[in-house]
Design a protein with these regions (language model features):
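Extracellular "leader-to-stem" segments immediately downstream of a signal peptide or signal-anchor
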Residues: 2-149, 154-369, 543-588
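Conserved short loop/turn motifs at secondary-structure junctions
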Residues: 148-157, 376-379, 398-400
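Short, glycine/charged-enriched secondary-structure capping and boundary segments
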Residues: 160-163, 371-372, 484, 533
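Right-handed parallel beta-helix
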Residues: 165, 174, 352-363, 386-397, ...
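Extracellular beta-strand/beta-solenoid scaffold signature
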Residues: 184-226, 337-346, 370-381, 397-399, ...
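Ordered hydrophobic segments in well-structured contexts
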Residues: 271-275, 315, 379-381, 389, ...
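Aromatic-lined, polymer-binding surfaces characteristic
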Residues: 405
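Catalytic domains of carbohydrate-active enzymes that cleave complex glycans
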Residues: 472, 492-588
Length: 588
C-alpha cells in the first residue's frame, strides 16, 4: 500500500531532526489555556508561539509529508498538533506515567539497610522476613528508601511494598538479586477465576514483588484463601468499596476542567475516581469503540466478561478547585454524559510515591505449566498504585513478568524479561490507565516452549486506556490486545520479532476500542498480526511500520463497516518523524 493511502499515524522525536524547543514553543497556547483553567482543546488550534514558527508538520498542504532532516512527517502528526486532546485516531498520552512522565523519580532521604534487619546476601538464608520488616519500618516512619547491597538474597515469601513513599532499591540489576524459591500458589494458595472454569488466576495476577496498598493486599489475599474469587481494582473485592463525592456535569473528551454539583469533598492534590456507568443500550461501550454504525450494530449483551468491567473507573488527581469548577491533572479520557451517571467517587486507599529499583528477581527455574495453569512464579506487580515506578529491574524464569493491575500513572523504565520463557512478559489489565513502559526488553527464551503453552508479549485488556509502550526491544512476543476492549493505547519506537499470539475470551468482547496507535514499529520477521491494525481497530492509526504479511494467527475486525482507520508511511519506519510519539507529545 502506498504512503498516499492515508489510514492514520502519529509520533515525534526531538532527537530526530525536530527540537524540543520547537515543540514546546508551539504548545504555548495550549499550556496557557490549561493554566487559565479553560479547555485546552479550544486553545489547541492556536498552538504556535510568536517567533517559534510552525509546529512540525503544520506547514505542508493536505496529503503531503513534510521533510524533517532525512525523514518525513506524516499528515497525522500535523493534524494531531491542531487538536491534541480530541484527535479521532491518536490519543493524547503526553502525560502518561509517574508524575506525568517525569524523567526523575522522587527521592526519599530516609535510608534503611536490610542488613540492619537481619537480611544476609548469602543466597541460602531466607531474607524475605528481614526485607519485609525493613519495608514495614519505612512505611511506619512515613516513607524511606530500603537498600539492598550487592549479592544474592534468597526469598521464600512475597516481598510486599504496601505503604506510600517507600522505595526498595538494590545496587543495580546486575549486582543485586532476589532469588525466589516458591510460587504464589505455595505462598498464598490456589487462585481460581471469578468467571469460572479451572484456570489459575496466577496466570495473569500477582507478583513475588508486589506493590499494593496494605489493606487492599490483605483483603485480596483473604478472599483468595476463602476461595471467594475477587475483583482486583480500586473499589474492593466486590466493587462496592466506594461512595459518591459529587455528580459531574456533561463535558467532552479532552476537557481538563469539569463542573461538579458539590465541591465540598474535593481538594487539590486528592486522588479521586471518575466513574462512568454503562446504560442498557451500551452507549458507553459504543463511545469507547468510537461510535457510529459499527459499534451500534455490535452485539454487546452476550459479552458478559466485558460488561462486568464497567463501570469504567479512571483515577485522577485534582489539580485545582475553583468554586464548582474542578481542574484535573489529565484531560478527560471520554465524554461525560448524563446517561452514564458520571460521578467523582472515593476508592480504596492508594499506594503512591513508591517504587522498586536496581535489582533482578530470579525465580527458581521450573518447567513452564500448560496455558492458564501457571503456579505464580511471577515478577513485579503494581496494583491499586498511582504515581509509582519500577526502574532498572530484570525478572528471570518467571511465569509472568511485569504487571499493572488496576494501576494508573505508573512508569516501568529499563525493565527486562529473561530466562526460560513466560506467558505474559508484560500485562496491563483490570482498568489500568495512563501508564508508561519505556526502555523495555523481552529476551528470547532460553528453553523451548512446550506445545500447550502460549506466549503473548505486551498485553493490554480490561478497558485499560491511555497506556504507552515506548522504546522497546521484543525478541519474542506480540502486541497482545487481549480482548476486553482496551482503547486509546500507544506502542511506539519498538523493534519486534512478532512470533507471539494474542489471547482473550470471546465473552470479553472486541480486541480493540478506538484510538489505538502503532507508530514506528520495526517488524523483523514480516508478520502483520496485531501490528498492522488498519484492518482491525476502529479509529486507529498505523504509522511507519515495516511492510508485513498475514500468517499464523489472523484476525478479522470485530466491527462491521468503515473502521475509520488510517495508515501512513507504510513500509518506512526509519523515515517517520517524529520517531517516538510519546516523546513528541510530551512537548505539548
Amino acid at each position: 500500500m502506498s504512503e498516499a493511502h492515508d489510514t492514520n499515524g502519529n509520533g515525534n522525536d526531538p532527537r530526530a531532526g525536530l527540537t524540543r524547543r520547537g515543540l514546546l514553543g508551539g504548545a504555548v497556547a495550549v499550556g496557557a489555556g490549561v493554566a487559565a483553567g479553560g479547555d485546552p482543546a479550544a486553545a489547541a488550534p492556536a498552538a504556535r508561539a510568536p517567533g517559534q514558527g510552525h509546529l512540525p508538520g503544520t506547514e505542508q498542504g493536505p496529503g503531503r509529508e513534510q521533510e524533517a532532516g532525512r525523514g518525513r512527517v506524516p499528515r497525522l502528526w500535523r493534524e494531531f498538533t491542531q487538536r491534541p486532546y480530541t484527535h479521532p485516531q491518536i490519543p493524547y498520552i503526553g502525560r502518561a506515567g509517574c508524575r506525568g512522565g517525569a524523567e526523575r523519580f522522587p527521592h526519599h532521604p530516609r535510608v534503611l539497610d536490610v542488613r540492619a534487619f537481619g537480611a544476609r546476601a548469602d543466597g541460602a538464608t531466607d531474607a524475605a522476613p528481614a526485607i519485609n520488616r525493613a519495608i514495614a519500618a519505612a512505611g511506619r516512619a512515613g516513607g524511606g528508601t530500603v537498600t539492598l547491597p550487592p549479592g544474592t538474597f534468597r526469598i521464600d515469601d512475597v516481598i510486599r511494598v504496601g505503604h506510600s513513599n517507600v522505595v526498595l532499591r538494590g545496587a543495580g540489576s546486575g549486582r543485586t538479586t532476589l532469588y525466589a524459591t516458591r510460587s504464589l500458589t505455595e505462598l498464598i494458595g490456589v487462585y481460581g477465576s471469578r468467571y469460572g472454569g479451572d484456570k489459575s488466576s496466577w496466570s495473569w495476577a500477582g507478583g513475588l514483588v508486589w506493590l499494593a496498598p496494605e489493606a487492599r493486599w490483605n483483603s485480596l489475599v483473604a478472599a483468595i484463601r476463602a476461595r471467594a474469587w475477587p475483583f482486583e481494582g480500586w473499589t474492593g473485592n466486590r466493587r462496592d468499596a466506594w461512595r459518591t463525592l459529587t455528580r459531574v456535569a456533561p463535558a467532552l473528551q479532552g476537557s481538563w476542567t469539569v463542573t461538579v454539583t458539590d465541591p465540598a469533598g474535593l481538594r487539590a492534590g486528592a486522588l479521586v475516581l471518575l466513574r462512568l456507568s454503562d446504560d442498557p443500550a451500551h452507549t458507553l461501550l459504543e463511545h469507547m469503540a468510537g461510535g457510529g454504525p459499527g459499534p451500534e450494530a455490535y452485539v454487546w449483551d452476550d459479552k458478559t466478561k466485558l460488561t462486568s468491567y464497567v463501570p469504567y473507573e479512571w483515577p485522577v488527581r485534582i489539580a485545582r478547585v475553583h468554586g464548582r469548577r474542578v481542574t484535573l491533572e489529565r484531560p478527560l479520557p471520554l465524554d461525560v454524559r448524563p446517561e452514564w451517571d458520571p460521578q467523582l467517587t472515593t476508592h480504596v486507599q492508594e499506594l503512591t510515591g513508591s517504587g522498586v529499583e536496581g535489582l533482578t528477581l530470579e525465580a527458581v527455574q521450573t518447567p513452564q505449566q500448560p496455558h492458564l495453569l501457571d503456579k505464580g512464579y511471577n515478577g513485579v506487580v503494581l496494583q491499586c498504585a498511582y504515581d509509582c515506578w519500577v526502574d532498572d529491574v530484570t525478572v528471570r524464569h518467571v511465569d509472568n513478568g511485569f504487571g499493572l493491575v488496576a494501576a494508573s500513572a505508573c512508569t516501568l523504565r529499563r525493565t527486562r524479561v529473561a530466562g526460560r520463557g513466560s506467558h505474559h512478559p508484560y500485562f496491563c489489565r483490570e482498568g489500568s490507565h495512563d501508564n508508561l513502559v519505556e526502555d523495555f526488553t523481552i529476551e528470547e527464551r532460553t528453553v523451548p516452549g512446550r506445545p500447550d503453552t502460549q506466549l503473548h508479549g505486551v498485553n493490554v485488556e480490561g478497558l485499560s486506556s491511555y497506556n504507552v509502550w515506548s522504546r522497546g526491544e521484543m525478541r519474542m512476543g506480540t502486541f497482545d490486545s487481549h480482548r476486553g476492549m482496551p482503547f486509546a493505547d500507544v506502542r511506539t519506537d519498538i523493534t519486534l520479532n512478532n512470533n507471539g499470539r494474542h489471547g482473550g475470551d470471546g465473552s470479553a468482547g472486541p480486541l480493540f476500542g478506538a484510538r489505538f496507535t502503532h507508530w514506528n514499529i520495526r517488524v523483523v520477521n514480516g508478520r502483520a498480526g496485531l501490528v498492522r491494525i488498519d484492518g482491525l481497530a476502529p479509529y486507529s492509526a498505523t504509522v511507519g511500520i515495516d511492510e508485513v504479511t498475514e500468517f499464523d494467527q489472523i484476525d478479522v475486525p470485530d466491527f462491521t463497516g468503515d473502521l475509520h482507520a488510517r495508515l501512513e508511511l507504510y513500509g518506512a519506519p526509519d523515515a517517520v518523524r517524529p520517531r517516538n510519539l510519546h516523546e513528541a507529545q510530551r512537548g505539548l
